[in-house]
Amino acid sequence: MRPPLLALLCACTLMALVARAARAEDLPPEIKLEGGHYTPAELSVPANTTFKLRVTNADAAAIEFESFELHRERVVQPGETITVYMPAMAPGTYKYIDDFHPETPEGTLIAK
């Protein structure tokens, strides 16, 4: 292979890898309720900036994603994924629950 062609091939491969990494970083943070537990139980999110949070209900019954501290409350039907628009949060920890099922362990957003 000729050197200029090899350099072009390497440059294109590097650009594709960088673009793929950038897309992964652009994906909104996501939590999932499955088997009566939130996954992950703790999620780090950006502080002092608004963002979208994806909430997926993989259980057989409707849930109510609720955070009293953040004034967010949304019903999520079985098998549904919703987007919750989150406010800019000061650094700290913020709890969320499934208000329909109080026995479900709470989850935590950690704003950093």
Per-range role (PLM):
Residues M1-A7:
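Positively charged n-region of N-terminal signal peptides that target proteins for export
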Residues V18-A24:
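Sec/Tat signal peptide C-region and signal peptidase I cleavage site
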Residues E25-N48:
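N-terminal edge beta-strand
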Residues E34-A41, S67-H71, G79-T83:
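N-terminal post-signal-peptidase region of extra-cytosolic proteins
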Residues A58-P78, G107:
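Histidine- and aromatic-enriched segments that form or immediately flank copper-ligand environments
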